[in-house]
Every structure is written in C-alpha cells, then in structure tokens.
Design a protein with these regions (language model features):
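RNA-binding basic/glycine-rich loop and surface signature characteristic of RAMP-family CRISPR effectors
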Residues: 1-304
Length: 304
C-alpha cells in the first residue's frame, strides 16, 4: 500500500430517525444533548466503535486488519502477545545492553523493545495505526498518536428527546408472575429522537500516518467504513441511522494548503423551513462552496 502524502479534512453528515444515536449512561441512557442549546451530541468514541465493528466484519482474518479495542478484549494480554510474537522474553534481561543491563520490571518492555512492540501493534491492528492507542499498561508497548482524529458530532438544529412507555408480555421471575396474578406484563421506557441530522469533523495527518504505517489504502477503507458503518450496526434502540454525505477536502501537500475551519465553513447545512420541525434529510439543504478554492485543495463528495 502506498504511503499517505496528503493532508485530508472531512465532514460527516449522518441522521437518525426514531432512535437513540448515542445514549448517555450518566443520564439514564437518554440521547446526549447540549443542555444550553438543545443540540444533540454523538461522541467520537461512538463513531470509532462503529468503524471498528465494520472493519471486524468486512476484513475478518486479513493480516493487518485485526482490531485492538474490541468487545470483551483483554488489552494487556494482547500487548503481551506482541512480545511473544517478536521473541522478546520480558522476564529476562534485555538482549541489547542499550536497553539496560537488567530488566527494571519483570514482564515489562524497556528501551528499544517498546519501539518494537509499538511497531508490531501498528502493523497488526487497524484501529491502532488509524486512531492511536495508549498501550503503556502491562507489558508496555508505549503510546500511539493516531493520524485520524474525530470531533463529537453535533446536530445541525436542536433535537427533541421523546420518552415512550412500552410493554413486554412476559415477566422475568415466578415471583413477579404470582404478584401479578398471571397477567405477566412488564412496563418499560424507551427514549428516541424523532429526527436529527448530525455533523462531525475529521482530520488526517500524513506525518502521523507515516509513523504508524497508515496508508492510502487504509484511508480508502476508512471512508468506505464511514459510508457503510450504520448498515452493519442496526438495532431497534438506534432506529434508522444513515450516513448521508462524507465531504472530503484533500490538500496538495503534507502540511496542508488551508486551515481546516476555513474549509469546513464552505459546507453549509440549512433547514428548508426554519419554522417547521425537520423529520427527514429532505428538510435540509447541503451546499458546498467550491468557488475560489485555495490553491491545492480538491473537494470530494461521497454519498451513502
């Protein structure tokens, strides 16, 4: 895969209909919301989780496309496995005197061993070389600053969170059944957003990509993941979520040809009717100002 040599900045536009895009565990799993503005929020962690799930499903068992942070993973065990595969015994003194005459802490890498472990992790795990990771626990593979960074997603206009009462025609225990006299019903609640269009921003650094081994092929796969991640992550709780657009600004250099905020300002998302609550993507217009683009900037609009 070819080396990434161009900076990229991008905008993600996705929506939710009758679902909870990202519950807040500190607020009874209600949809995340900015209490001052009423804007809906989706964390960067939530978006990266969906990318990881997409890669796991579509790149299963392909070398170099495993996922480090996955469900039920024991991260320290994975880090220790790196050194086993590298043939580095962390209970013996380092092979090179440059790394120390003795092992400072048994079971923990030191000196250039950490660099070897970090390189192995980047080569093996897509999410490590993409988003970075803190791997300084356990056997210690250091830290990786990811070339791809995401912001929180924020709804274009304020959202409304609705609470619905639901009924299950069953109970969990015999005691509950006896208490209800055989009626066997369980009441519950479900929180949804009727409709929300969310906007997130992302950044790709070629300098950091060269350090982690994140390639142009990895970038293509990442954009494919953004476009399709909701298709493979359906649940009743999340309702209908769709990636509507991925708008990419490709720079003609590693350092970039324009500030990211100036490029993002060119993407204008406005309600068609500001007085009527939006209930579909058609209730918004999306315009990308491509007039008088800074020299070296190329705009690509990917649609889901």
């Amino acid at each position: 895969m070819s080396e990434l040599k161009n900076r990229h900045d991008f905008v993600l536009l996705f929506d939710v209909q009758d679902g909870n895009p990202n519950g807040d565990p500190d607020a009874g799993n209600l949809p995340r919301i900015d209490p001052e503005t009423g804007d809906g929020l989706v964390t960067d962690v939530s978006l990266k989780r969906k990318v990881r799930n997409f890669i796991l499903l579509t790149q299963e068992k392909k070398p170099g496309f495993d996922i480090f942070v996955k469900e039920k993973a024991v991260l320290n065990s994975t880090i220790a496995q790196a050194y086993k595969d590298l043939g580095v015994d962390l209970n013996e003194k380092p092979k090179s005197d440059k790394d120390g005459k003795k092992r400072n802490t048994k079971g923990e890498a030191q000196g250039s061993e950490v660099d070897q472990g970090r390189a192995w992790m980047c080569k093996t795990f897509f999410d490590v070389r993409t988003f970075g990771a803190v791997m300084s626990t356990g056997a210690n593979a250091g830290q990786v600053r990811g070339p791809v960074q995401l912001t929180f997603a924020r709804s274009v206009t304020p959202i409304v969170s609705l609470e619905h009462s639901i009924t299950r025609m069953a109970v969990a225990t015999e005691a509950e059944a006896e208490k209800q006299g055989g009626d066997n019903r369980t009441m519950g609640r479900k929180n949804t957003v009727p409709y929300g269009l969310y906007r997130a921003h992302g950044f790709v650094s070629p300098h950091l990509a060269q350090q982690t081994g994140f390639s142009s092929g990895d970038l293509d796969l990442l954009f494919k993941a953004f476009l399709n991640m909701f298709e493979l992550d359906r649940s009743a709780a999340r309702g209908l979520m769709s990636m509507r657009k991925v708008i990419v600004f490709k720079h003609g250099s590693e350092l970039g040809n324009a500030p990211a905020h100036a490029l993002f300002d060119r993407v204008q998302v406005t309600p068609v009717n500001g007085e009527k609550p939006a209930r579909s993507f058609k209730d918004y217009t999306v315009k990308v100002d491509t007039a008088k683009l800074p020299q070296g900037i190329e705009v690509m609009e990917l649609a889901g």
